[in-house]
Amino acid sequence: MASPRFNSIIIILFICTISLSIVSISCKEDLKTNQAALFAFGDSLFEAGNNNYFDSISSFRSNFWPYGKTTFKFPTGRVSDGRIMIDFIAEYAWLPLIPPNLQPGYSNSQLTYGLNFATTAAGVFAGTFPGSVTNLSKDLGTQLNNFKNVEKTLRSNLGDAEARRVISKAVYLFHIGANDYQYPFFANTSTFSNTTKERFIDFVIGNTTTVIEELYKLGARKFGFLSLGPFGCTPSALIINSTKIGSCFEPVTELINLHNQEFPKVLRRLERRLSGFKYALHDFHTSLSQRINNPSRYGFKEGEMACCGSGPLRGINTCGFRNGPSQGYKLCENADDYVFFDPSHLTETAHQQIAELIWSGPPNVTAPYNLKTLFRL
């Protein structure tokens, strides 16, 4: 027969167990209530599958093998072999995977965790890569309008006060503009015959700023931005000039460098002008350039050659028979050895490294806040 002391110990342990369970449940509920959402806007760097729901031409889709082969084991629409930086940032923020906003079937509760509006080939302008989808727009203005619809749904489902809390606490992450600078050369347009490079950059940044201000009017306060990467030095860009294989495409490089000089000035002006406006700006250009130019320092074997593609540096965009079965492609054995998965897009490993810098990078990499700090505000 058990002693009274033993019975007392059992009772105390039982009470402690119940108490810990209650605390655990309370903490989880508190996390759900106070967790900041993540809303993403942009282009193929953040694409999580929206293009699956467009009538897109095949060269702008990634819902076929070998995309997605590393982690998901099937193509999700992400333009990578696996996860992208949005996925990692969501993980660091204790959020579920953030779904593409066009994906059917997500629950209303998912809206309180965020949505991804980014789409391959999207630009600030509606006229950037206009033939990539049929009878639809996916530019930054359209992405803003899609968010406005979500905002209305949040107000309808949660009430005005709770919707305002979700919107003000959320983080809004952007990567946009690179396609606007690449498209004039891709399509051989007369853009720069009619306007100066500086004026064109003003248009790109000005339209981006308008969207930021519209989100601010809706209650958004915390923003994250990536500078534009060295897209004149991707495998696809390195083979544009057949007489200089391996050389960066200078016209795009020049525009991106000018953009990256001007955009931080605009953000500082917004910070001074808009009460409560806080932001993180990650120097994506430097982070990616370092990995292209010195891959072994970051655990890669190849910085300029793509894992999947054809031709010199696998820089021709035929990955997964993208342009039909008549155009074959080569696929590397281990994507983790490569910075680029296809001629223009990063591997999961590269995405993860960049995501870590956006999340918790020091002030010389991500400033004036990093995303970890923004999520805690």
Swiss-Prot record:
It is found in: Secreted. Its main location: secreted. One of its GO terms (biological process) is lipid catabolic process. InterPro entries: GDSL, GLIP1-5/GLL25, Lipase_GDSL_AS, SGNH_hydro_sf, SGNH_plant_lipase-like. GO terms for cellular component: extracellular region. It holds the Pfam family Lipase_GDSL. This is GDSL esterase/lipase 4.
